[in-house]
Amino acid sequence: GVIWDINRVGPSTGLPTRTQQGDLTMLYEASHGDTQHIVLIPGTVDECFEFGWRAFDVAEQFQTLVFGFSDLDLGMNRWATAGFEYPDQKLDRGKVIRTQEQLDAIENFGRYRDVDGDGIPYRTLPGSGLEPILYRGTGHDEDGIYSEDPGIYAATVARLKRKIEGARDLLPAPILREENDKQVGIIYYGSVENTITEIDDILESTTGLKVSTCRVRALPYLSLIHIRRSRRSIRS
């Protein structure tokens, strides 16, 4: 499933015509317990369209809820575009078993069994005539049977963690603008793209500071971000 959050100023009714970006951490860790979610963060109206269909693609591949996150500046105001780019290939439905032969090829099939080690189990579709689907909202084992066993619970949480971690490098990568002399770094997201570009120009023209920027476009971060941040002393 996909849920799109267009953030305005809160709390409660808040300021209904003002933009804000404070919902990001709420979406990333939504729900109770130890959990994470995939969040796509467009910064332009073109990316809003692209990330819209891409969110459904990712949700199918990883069998998980995906949040789209934009702010009121993008969601309510008028923006110009040269035209949206449509997907040039079919969306990936992920690990869907469509035939009895495919089902028989999996030893000891279970709806939540991690066959490939990536945290994403195989699934059948309702009405396919294959193995019936058993979904539970409570704790369950690999076969979907209710369980409160600590070991099974820990294994389930670890599997979900592997699934989200595996999405890192398939999500929209951050956009980096790097200076050779890395004096100042700005990490940002969302519709402040034009504002940050203006700040970059003002700082460099008035102070001579060289500004490098990184616009994050998805959570979890691209794995490369962790490597780059660990190698540099940068103020954010």
Write out the residue ranges for each language-model feature.
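Peripheral docking tails and interdomain loops at the edges
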Residues: 31-32, 37, 46, 224, ...
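Active-site/ligand-binding-proximal alpha/beta "capping" segment
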Residues: 34-59
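Acidic/polar loop patches that form or flank catalytic/metal-binding clefts of enzymes
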Residues: 1-4, 13, 36-37, 63-69
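Acidic, glycine-rich active-site loops and adjacent beta-strand->loop/helix elements
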Residues: 5-12, 44-46, 72-74, 217-220
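Flexible glycine/proline-rich, aromatic-decorated loop/lid segments
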Residues: 3-34
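Flexible, low-complexity linker and terminal segments
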Residues: 51, 56-224, 228, 236
